Amino acid sequence: MKTKFCTGGEAEPSPLGLLLSCGGNAAPTPGVGQQRDAAGELESKQLGGRTQPLALPPPPPPPLPLPPPPSPPLADEQPEPRTRRRAYLWCKEFLPGAWRGLREDQFHISVIRGGLSNMLFQCSLPDSIASVGDEPRKVLLRLYGAILKMRSCNKEGSEQAQNENEFQGAEAMVLESVMFAILAERSLGPKLFGIFPQGRLEQFIPSRRLDTEELRLPDISAEIAEKMATFHGMKMPFNKEPKWLFGTMEKYLNQVLRLKFSREARVQQLHKILSYNLPLELENLRSLLQYTRSPVVFCHNDCQEGNILLLEGQENSERRKLMLIDFEYSSYNYRGFDIGNHFCEWMYDYTYEKYPFFRANIQKYPSRKQQLHFISSYLTTFQNDFESLSSEEQFATKEDMLLEVNRFALASHFLWGLWSIVQAKISSIEFGYMEYAQARFEAYFDQKRKLGV
Protein backbone atom coordinates (compact mmCIF):
# COMPACT_ATOMS: atom_id res chain seq x y z
CA MET A 1 0.00 0.00 0.00
CA LYS A 2 1.70 3.15 -1.07
CA THR A 3 0.73 6.80 -0.78
CA LYS A 4 -0.17 8.94 -3.75
CA PHE A 5 1.60 12.25 -4.33
CA CYS A 6 0.71 14.45 -7.27
CA THR A 7 1.81 17.70 -8.84
CA GLY A 8 1.46 19.34 -12.18
CA GLY A 9 -0.92 21.44 -14.21
CA GLU A 10 -4.58 21.01 -14.86
CA ALA A 11 -4.03 19.18 -18.13
CA GLU A 12 -2.12 16.38 -16.43
CA PRO A 13 -3.69 13.28 -14.93
CA SER A 14 -3.84 12.70 -11.21
CA PRO A 15 -1.79 9.79 -9.82
CA LEU A 16 -4.78 7.62 -10.65
CA GLY A 17 -4.43 8.55 -14.30
CA LEU A 18 -7.88 10.13 -14.11
CA LEU A 19 -9.28 13.51 -15.07
CA LEU A 20 -12.69 14.73 -14.04
CA SER A 21 -12.81 16.82 -17.19
CA CYS A 22 -11.50 14.15 -19.55
CA GLY A 23 -13.51 11.63 -21.48
CA GLY A 24 -13.17 9.49 -24.54
CA ASN A 25 -12.01 5.97 -25.12
CA ALA A 26 -8.51 5.21 -26.21
CA ALA A 27 -7.78 1.87 -27.79
CA PRO A 28 -4.99 -0.21 -26.28
CA THR A 29 -1.67 1.09 -27.52
CA PRO A 30 1.33 -0.87 -28.73
CA GLY A 31 3.96 1.08 -26.82
CA VAL A 32 4.56 3.83 -24.33
CA GLY A 33 5.61 6.44 -26.88
CA GLN A 34 2.76 5.56 -29.19
CA GLN A 35 0.02 6.49 -27.15
CA ARG A 36 4.36 0.77 1.77
CA ASP A 37 3.32 7.87 11.16
CA ALA A 38 5.91 8.98 13.38
CA ALA A 39 8.86 10.60 11.68
CA GLY A 40 8.59 13.32 9.09
CA GLU A 41 12.25 12.85 8.16
CA LEU A 42 12.69 9.31 9.32
CA GLU A 43 13.12 9.22 7.31
CA SER A 44 14.23 -3.22 -28.30
CA LYS A 45 13.25 -2.17 -31.30
CA GLN A 46 9.47 -2.76 -31.50
CA LEU A 47 8.48 -6.41 -31.31
CA GLY A 48 7.49 -7.04 -34.89
CA GLY A 49 8.66 -10.62 -34.92
CA ARG A 50 9.17 -13.18 -32.22
CA THR A 51 12.06 -12.89 -29.83
CA GLN A 52 14.35 -15.57 -28.53
CA PRO A 53 13.43 -16.95 -25.11
CA LEU A 54 14.31 -14.43 -22.44
CA ALA A 55 17.09 -15.85 -20.31
CA LEU A 56 17.30 -14.51 -16.79
CA PRO A 57 20.85 -15.09 -15.49
CA PRO A 58 21.37 -15.99 -11.85
CA PRO A 59 21.09 -12.83 -9.77
CA PRO A 60 23.99 -11.52 -7.68
CA PRO A 61 24.02 -11.65 -3.89
CA PRO A 62 21.46 -9.33 -2.31
CA PRO A 63 22.63 -5.71 -1.87
CA LEU A 64 21.22 -5.55 1.66
CA PRO A 65 21.88 -7.89 4.61
CA LEU A 66 19.00 -10.03 5.72
CA PRO A 67 18.11 -9.31 9.36
CA PRO A 68 16.57 -12.00 11.57
CA PRO A 69 12.83 -12.63 11.28
CA PRO A 70 10.56 -10.07 12.95
CA SER A 71 9.07 -10.60 16.37
CA PRO A 72 5.26 -10.88 16.70
CA PRO A 73 3.37 -7.57 16.56
CA LEU A 74 1.93 -5.99 19.67
CA ALA A 75 -1.70 -6.89 20.34
CA ASP A 76 -4.50 -4.33 20.70
CA GLU A 77 -2.33 -1.30 20.03
CA GLN A 78 -4.40 1.80 20.75
CA PRO A 79 -4.54 5.06 18.75
CA GLU A 80 -3.98 8.46 20.31
CA PRO A 81 -7.03 9.92 22.15
CA ARG A 82 -7.89 12.44 19.42
CA THR A 83 -7.94 9.73 16.74
CA ARG A 84 -10.04 7.49 18.97
CA ARG A 85 -12.58 10.25 19.52
CA ARG A 86 -12.89 11.01 15.81
CA ALA A 87 -13.16 7.31 14.94
CA TYR A 88 -15.97 6.90 17.47
CA LEU A 89 -17.92 9.82 16.00
CA TRP A 90 -17.49 8.59 12.42
CA CYS A 91 -18.73 5.12 13.33
CA LYS A 92 -21.64 6.48 15.37
CA GLU A 93 -22.73 8.87 12.62
CA PHE A 94 -22.19 6.72 9.53
CA LEU A 95 -23.10 3.23 10.69
CA PRO A 96 -26.67 2.07 11.38
CA GLY A 97 -28.29 -0.01 14.08
CA ALA A 98 -26.50 -0.49 17.37
CA TRP A 99 -23.76 1.96 16.40
CA ARG A 100 -26.21 4.85 16.67
CA GLY A 101 -26.65 4.44 20.43
CA LEU A 102 -23.09 3.43 21.23
CA ARG A 103 -21.37 5.30 24.07
CA GLU A 104 -17.73 6.25 23.62
CA ASP A 105 -16.64 4.12 26.59
CA GLN A 106 -18.21 1.09 24.83
CA PHE A 107 -16.37 1.74 21.57
CA HIS A 108 -13.58 -0.71 20.68
CA ILE A 109 -10.71 0.31 18.38
CA SER A 110 -7.24 -1.10 17.68
CA VAL A 111 -4.43 -0.25 15.29
CA ILE A 112 -3.77 -2.42 12.24
CA ARG A 113 -0.06 -2.29 11.43
CA GLY A 114 1.60 -2.64 8.04
CA GLY A 115 0.31 0.22 5.87
CA LEU A 116 2.93 2.38 4.16
CA SER A 117 0.39 4.95 2.99
CA ASN A 118 -2.66 5.10 5.20
CA MET A 119 -3.42 4.58 8.88
CA LEU A 120 -5.69 1.58 9.46
CA PHE A 121 -7.87 0.71 12.46
CA GLN A 122 -10.33 -2.01 13.38
CA CYS A 123 -13.47 -0.56 15.00
CA SER A 124 -15.98 -2.88 16.64
CA LEU A 125 -19.04 -3.20 18.85
CA PRO A 126 -18.51 -4.84 22.24
CA ASP A 127 -19.95 -8.32 22.79
CA SER A 128 -22.36 -6.84 25.34
CA ILE A 129 -24.14 -4.78 22.66
CA ALA A 130 -26.68 -6.75 20.62
CA SER A 131 -27.15 -6.11 16.91
CA VAL A 132 -30.33 -4.28 15.90
CA GLY A 133 -30.40 -5.37 12.27
CA ASP A 134 -27.80 -6.39 9.74
CA GLU A 135 -25.29 -3.69 10.68
CA PRO A 136 -21.63 -4.77 10.65
CA ARG A 137 -20.14 -5.54 14.05
CA LYS A 138 -16.63 -4.71 12.85
CA VAL A 139 -15.44 -2.19 10.28
CA LEU A 140 -12.12 -1.05 8.90
CA LEU A 141 -11.33 2.65 9.33
CA ARG A 142 -8.87 3.99 6.76
CA LEU A 143 -7.36 7.43 7.35
CA TYR A 144 -5.57 8.87 4.36
CA GLY A 145 -1.84 9.39 4.79
CA ALA A 146 0.75 11.64 3.24
CA ILE A 147 -1.36 12.65 0.26
CA LEU A 148 -2.94 15.21 2.60
CA LYS A 149 0.49 16.76 3.24
CA MET A 150 1.50 17.54 -0.33
CA ARG A 151 1.99 21.27 0.24
CA SER A 152 4.82 20.64 2.67
CA CYS A 153 6.90 19.05 -0.09
CA ASN A 154 6.55 22.00 -2.45
CA LYS A 155 6.86 25.08 -0.26
CA GLU A 156 9.05 26.84 -2.78
CA GLY A 157 6.53 26.46 -5.59
CA SER A 158 4.04 29.08 -6.69
CA GLU A 159 0.73 29.47 -4.92
CA GLN A 160 -0.98 28.35 -8.11
CA ALA A 161 1.11 25.16 -8.24
CA GLN A 162 0.37 24.46 -4.59
CA ASN A 163 -3.34 24.98 -5.15
CA GLU A 164 -3.22 22.63 -8.13
CA ASN A 165 -1.42 20.04 -5.99
CA GLU A 166 -4.12 20.25 -3.36
CA PHE A 167 -6.90 20.04 -5.95
CA GLN A 168 -5.39 17.01 -7.62
CA GLY A 169 -4.82 15.34 -4.27
CA ALA A 170 -8.46 15.83 -3.34
CA GLU A 171 -9.53 14.74 -6.82
CA ALA A 172 -7.49 11.55 -6.54
CA MET A 173 -9.08 10.65 -3.22
CA VAL A 174 -12.59 11.27 -4.54
CA LEU A 175 -11.97 9.20 -7.64
CA GLU A 176 -10.37 6.39 -5.67
CA SER A 177 -13.45 6.27 -3.46
CA VAL A 178 -15.67 6.13 -6.56
CA MET A 179 -13.55 3.27 -7.84
CA PHE A 180 -13.76 1.53 -4.47
CA ALA A 181 -17.56 1.77 -4.52
CA ILE A 182 -17.76 0.41 -8.08
CA LEU A 183 -15.57 -2.58 -7.24
CA ALA A 184 -17.63 -3.25 -4.12
CA GLU A 185 -20.83 -3.27 -6.17
CA ARG A 186 -19.21 -5.79 -8.51
CA SER A 187 -18.23 -7.95 -5.50
CA LEU A 188 -14.58 -7.45 -6.37
CA GLY A 189 -13.70 -5.60 -3.18
CA PRO A 190 -14.89 -4.78 0.34
CA LYS A 191 -18.15 -2.89 0.90
CA LEU A 192 -18.09 0.87 1.50
CA PHE A 193 -19.95 1.99 4.64
CA GLY A 194 -18.95 5.63 4.91
CA ILE A 195 -16.77 8.28 3.31
CA PHE A 196 -15.51 11.61 4.65
CA PRO A 197 -12.63 14.00 3.80
CA GLN A 198 -10.15 12.30 6.12
CA GLY A 199 -10.85 8.72 5.06
CA ARG A 200 -13.57 6.07 4.91
CA LEU A 201 -15.22 3.13 6.67
CA GLU A 202 -14.93 -0.21 4.88
CA GLN A 203 -16.16 -3.74 5.36
CA PHE A 204 -13.91 -5.65 7.72
CA ILE A 205 -13.24 -8.96 6.00
CA PRO A 206 -12.09 -11.86 8.21
CA SER A 207 -8.77 -12.55 6.57
CA ARG A 208 -5.09 -11.89 6.73
CA ARG A 209 -2.70 -10.29 4.31
CA LEU A 210 -0.33 -12.57 2.45
CA ASP A 211 3.29 -12.88 3.49
CA THR A 212 5.96 -12.15 0.90
CA GLU A 213 7.08 -15.79 0.85
CA GLU A 214 3.55 -16.93 -0.02
CA LEU A 215 3.66 -15.10 -3.36
CA ARG A 216 5.85 -17.88 -4.75
CA LEU A 217 3.54 -20.74 -3.74
CA PRO A 218 2.24 -22.21 -7.04
CA ASP A 219 -1.46 -22.19 -6.13
CA ILE A 220 -1.26 -18.68 -4.66
CA SER A 221 0.66 -17.35 -7.66
CA ALA A 222 -1.83 -18.90 -10.10
CA GLU A 223 -4.81 -17.36 -8.33
CA ILE A 224 -3.14 -13.94 -8.15
CA ALA A 225 -2.58 -14.20 -11.91
CA GLU A 226 -6.25 -15.06 -12.46
CA LYS A 227 -7.43 -12.24 -10.19
CA MET A 228 -5.18 -9.78 -12.00
CA ALA A 229 -6.42 -10.96 -15.40
CA THR A 230 -10.02 -10.43 -14.26
CA PHE A 231 -9.10 -6.96 -13.00
CA HIS A 232 -7.46 -6.17 -16.34
CA GLY A 233 -10.61 -7.20 -18.17
CA MET A 234 -12.86 -4.71 -16.38
CA LYS A 235 -14.36 -1.70 -18.12
CA MET A 236 -14.18 1.33 -15.83
CA PRO A 237 -15.56 4.88 -16.37
CA PHE A 238 -12.14 6.52 -16.12
CA ASN A 239 -9.61 8.15 -18.43
CA LYS A 240 -8.29 5.41 -20.71
CA GLU A 241 -5.15 7.21 -21.87
CA PRO A 242 -2.12 5.50 -20.29
CA LYS A 243 -0.69 8.70 -18.83
CA TRP A 244 -0.36 7.54 -15.25
CA LEU A 245 3.02 5.81 -15.35
CA PHE A 246 5.31 8.41 -16.87
CA GLY A 247 3.14 11.31 -15.73
CA THR A 248 3.58 10.16 -12.14
CA MET A 249 7.30 9.47 -12.48
CA GLU A 250 7.85 12.93 -13.96
CA LYS A 251 5.97 14.55 -11.08
CA TYR A 252 7.89 12.57 -8.48
CA LEU A 253 11.20 13.38 -10.17
CA ASN A 254 10.43 17.10 -10.25
CA GLN A 255 9.70 16.96 -6.53
CA VAL A 256 12.83 14.94 -5.77
CA LEU A 257 15.06 17.41 -7.62
CA ARG A 258 13.74 20.22 -5.39
CA LEU A 259 13.78 18.36 -2.08
CA LYS A 260 15.87 19.64 0.82
CA PHE A 261 16.58 17.66 3.98
CA SER A 262 17.90 19.13 7.22
CA ARG A 263 19.45 15.92 8.57
CA GLU A 264 22.93 15.30 7.19
CA ALA A 265 22.34 11.56 6.83
CA ARG A 266 19.35 12.22 4.59
CA VAL A 267 21.31 14.81 2.61
CA GLN A 268 24.02 12.25 1.87
CA GLN A 269 21.52 9.56 0.94
CA LEU A 270 19.76 11.90 -1.48
CA HIS A 271 23.09 13.01 -2.96
CA LYS A 272 24.03 9.39 -3.68
CA ILE A 273 20.74 8.67 -5.44
CA LEU A 274 20.89 11.90 -7.46
CA SER A 275 24.37 10.89 -8.66
CA TYR A 276 22.63 8.27 -10.81
CA ASN A 277 21.50 11.07 -13.18
CA LEU A 278 17.83 10.23 -12.77
CA PRO A 279 16.54 12.58 -15.52
CA LEU A 280 18.70 10.78 -18.10
CA GLU A 281 17.72 7.38 -16.73
CA LEU A 282 14.05 8.29 -17.03
CA GLU A 283 14.45 9.28 -20.67
CA ASN A 284 16.34 6.06 -21.41
CA LEU A 285 13.58 4.08 -19.74
CA ARG A 286 10.96 5.91 -21.79
CA SER A 287 12.85 5.10 -24.99
CA LEU A 288 13.10 1.42 -24.08
CA LEU A 289 9.43 1.01 -23.18
CA GLN A 290 8.34 2.98 -26.24
CA TYR A 291 9.31 -0.05 -28.31
CA THR A 292 7.88 -2.66 -25.98
CA ARG A 293 4.40 -3.90 -26.85
CA SER A 294 2.05 -3.89 -23.88
CA PRO A 295 -1.75 -3.54 -24.02
CA VAL A 296 -3.45 -0.80 -22.02
CA VAL A 297 -5.78 -2.32 -19.43
CA PHE A 298 -7.29 -1.32 -16.10
CA CYS A 299 -4.39 -2.01 -13.71
CA HIS A 300 -4.15 -2.35 -9.96
CA ASN A 301 -0.62 -0.86 -10.05
CA ASP A 302 0.30 -1.99 -6.52
CA CYS A 303 -0.29 -5.74 -6.39
CA GLN A 304 1.99 -6.60 -3.48
CA GLU A 305 1.37 -9.11 -0.72
CA GLY A 306 -0.02 -6.51 1.67
CA ASN A 307 -2.78 -5.74 -0.81
CA ILE A 308 -3.88 -9.37 -1.23
CA LEU A 309 -6.14 -10.94 1.39
CA LEU A 310 -6.30 -14.65 2.22
CA LEU A 311 -9.96 -15.08 3.16
CA GLU A 312 -10.75 -16.81 6.43
CA GLY A 313 -12.37 -20.20 5.90
CA GLN A 314 -11.28 -20.33 2.25
CA GLU A 315 -7.68 -21.37 2.80
CA ASN A 316 -8.20 -24.78 1.17
CA SER A 317 -10.16 -23.47 -1.81
CA GLU A 318 -8.33 -23.84 -5.10
CA ARG A 319 -9.41 -20.62 -6.79
CA ARG A 320 -11.53 -18.55 -4.38
CA LYS A 321 -9.31 -17.85 -1.40
CA LEU A 322 -7.86 -14.45 -2.36
CA MET A 323 -9.14 -10.88 -2.71
CA LEU A 324 -7.30 -7.84 -4.09
CA ILE A 325 -7.66 -4.67 -2.01
CA ASP A 326 -6.35 -1.08 -1.88
CA PHE A 327 -7.06 0.45 -5.26
CA GLU A 328 -5.64 3.95 -4.68
CA TYR A 329 -3.16 3.64 -7.57
CA SER A 330 -5.47 1.81 -9.97
CA SER A 331 -5.73 3.33 -13.43
CA TYR A 332 -5.62 2.48 -17.09
CA ASN A 333 -1.97 1.59 -17.61
CA TYR A 334 0.34 -0.81 -19.43
CA ARG A 335 -0.24 -4.45 -18.53
CA GLY A 336 3.50 -5.06 -18.35
CA PHE A 337 3.84 -2.67 -15.44
CA ASP A 338 1.20 -4.37 -13.31
CA ILE A 339 2.74 -7.82 -13.72
CA GLY A 340 6.35 -6.64 -13.61
CA ASN A 341 5.60 -4.64 -10.48
CA HIS A 342 4.09 -7.73 -8.85
CA PHE A 343 7.21 -9.74 -9.68
CA CYS A 344 9.37 -7.04 -8.08
CA GLU A 345 7.36 -7.30 -4.88
CA TRP A 346 8.57 -10.89 -4.43
CA MET A 347 11.86 -9.32 -3.29
CA TYR A 348 10.56 -7.08 -0.48
CA ASP A 349 9.30 -8.00 2.97
CA TYR A 350 7.65 -5.09 4.80
CA THR A 351 7.00 -6.92 8.08
CA TYR A 352 10.45 -6.52 9.64
CA GLU A 353 9.98 -4.64 12.92
CA LYS A 354 13.38 -2.96 13.25
CA TYR A 355 14.70 -0.05 11.23
CA PRO A 356 14.44 0.29 8.23
CA PHE A 357 11.29 -1.86 8.65
CA PHE A 358 11.77 -3.87 5.46
CA ARG A 359 14.06 -6.56 4.07
CA ALA A 360 15.24 -6.79 0.46
CA ASN A 361 16.62 -9.80 -1.39
CA ILE A 362 17.19 -9.60 -5.15
CA GLN A 363 17.54 -13.38 -5.27
CA LYS A 364 13.81 -13.65 -4.52
CA TYR A 365 12.84 -12.23 -7.94
CA PRO A 366 10.82 -14.98 -9.67
CA SER A 367 12.73 -17.39 -11.85
CA ARG A 368 11.86 -17.93 -15.49
CA LYS A 369 9.87 -21.06 -14.50
CA GLN A 370 7.93 -19.15 -11.84
CA GLN A 371 7.21 -16.31 -14.25
CA LEU A 372 5.92 -18.71 -16.89
CA HIS A 373 3.67 -20.37 -14.31
CA PHE A 374 2.13 -16.99 -13.51
CA ILE A 375 1.87 -15.93 -17.15
CA SER A 376 0.19 -19.19 -18.20
CA SER A 377 -2.48 -18.79 -15.53
CA TYR A 378 -2.93 -15.16 -16.49
CA LEU A 379 -3.32 -15.82 -20.22
CA THR A 380 -5.77 -18.69 -19.65
CA THR A 381 -8.08 -16.22 -17.89
CA PHE A 382 -7.36 -13.03 -19.85
CA GLN A 383 -7.31 -14.46 -23.38
CA ASN A 384 -10.37 -16.61 -24.05
CA ASP A 385 -8.84 -18.46 -26.98
CA PHE A 386 -5.39 -18.98 -25.45
CA GLU A 387 -5.84 -22.69 -24.76
CA SER A 388 -7.06 -23.24 -28.33
CA LEU A 389 -3.82 -21.84 -29.77
CA SER A 390 -1.18 -24.20 -31.08
CA SER A 391 1.70 -25.02 -28.75
CA GLU A 392 3.97 -22.89 -30.96
CA GLU A 393 1.62 -19.90 -30.70
CA GLN A 394 1.29 -20.30 -26.94
CA PHE A 395 5.07 -20.47 -26.59
CA ALA A 396 5.57 -17.34 -28.69
CA THR A 397 2.90 -15.43 -26.76
CA LYS A 398 4.47 -16.30 -23.43
CA GLU A 399 7.98 -15.39 -24.64
CA ASP A 400 6.77 -11.97 -25.79
CA MET A 401 5.10 -11.47 -22.44
CA LEU A 402 8.28 -12.41 -20.56
CA LEU A 403 10.13 -9.64 -22.34
CA GLU A 404 7.26 -7.22 -21.78
CA VAL A 405 6.94 -7.68 -18.03
CA ASN A 406 10.68 -7.81 -17.28
CA ARG A 407 11.23 -4.53 -19.10
CA PHE A 408 8.34 -2.89 -17.29
CA ALA A 409 9.76 -4.17 -14.00
CA LEU A 410 12.37 -1.44 -14.51
CA ALA A 411 9.59 1.13 -14.34
CA SER A 412 8.38 -0.37 -11.08
CA HIS A 413 11.77 0.09 -9.43
CA PHE A 414 12.12 3.61 -10.79
CA LEU A 415 8.62 4.71 -9.78
CA TRP A 416 8.70 3.41 -6.21
CA GLY A 417 12.28 4.59 -5.76
CA LEU A 418 11.20 8.16 -6.53
CA TRP A 419 8.02 7.72 -4.50
CA SER A 420 10.00 6.63 -1.47
CA ILE A 421 12.27 9.68 -1.54
CA VAL A 422 9.22 11.94 -1.49
CA GLN A 423 7.72 9.94 1.37
CA ALA A 424 10.92 10.41 3.38
CA LYS A 425 10.07 14.11 3.40
CA ILE A 426 6.32 14.13 3.91
CA SER A 427 5.19 10.86 5.47
CA SER A 428 4.58 10.42 9.19
CA ILE A 429 4.68 6.61 8.93
CA GLU A 430 7.69 5.03 10.60
CA PHE A 431 9.62 3.45 7.73
CA GLY A 432 13.12 3.71 6.23
CA TYR A 433 12.00 5.43 3.05
CA MET A 434 15.46 6.57 1.93
CA GLU A 435 16.89 3.10 2.50
CA TYR A 436 13.98 1.66 0.52
CA ALA A 437 14.61 4.12 -2.31
CA GLN A 438 18.25 3.07 -2.43
CA ALA A 439 17.24 -0.61 -2.51
CA ARG A 440 14.84 0.01 -5.41
CA PHE A 441 17.42 1.86 -7.49
CA GLU A 442 20.00 -0.87 -6.82
CA ALA A 443 17.46 -3.39 -8.08
CA TYR A 444 16.71 -1.15 -11.09
CA PHE A 445 20.34 -1.20 -12.23
CA ASP A 446 20.61 -4.92 -11.53
CA GLN A 447 17.55 -5.55 -13.72
CA LYS A 448 19.07 -3.44 -16.49
CA ARG A 449 22.19 -5.60 -16.36
CA LYS A 450 20.15 -8.81 -16.56
CA LEU A 451 18.25 -7.54 -19.58
CA GLY A 452 21.35 -6.15 -21.26
CA VAL A 453 19.83 -2.69 -21.77
UniProtKB/Swiss-Prot annotation:
The keyword tRNA processing does not apply. The modification Phosphoserine is found at residues 71, 275. One of its GO terms (cellular component) is cytosol. Expressed ubiquitously with the highest level in testis. InterPro entries: Kinase-like_dom_sf (IPR011009). SUPFAM superfamilies: Protein kinase-like (PK-like). It is found in: Cytoplasm, Cytosol. It catalyses: choline + ATP = phosphocholine + ADP + H(+); ethanolamine + ATP = phosphoethanolamine + ADP + H(+). It comes from the Eukaryota. Plays a key role in phospholipid biosynthesis by catalyzing the phosphorylation of free choline to phosphocholine, the first step in phosphatidylcholine biosynthesis. Also phosphorylates ethanolamine, thereby contributing to phosphatidylethanolamine biosynthesis. Has higher activity with choline. This is Choline kinase alpha.
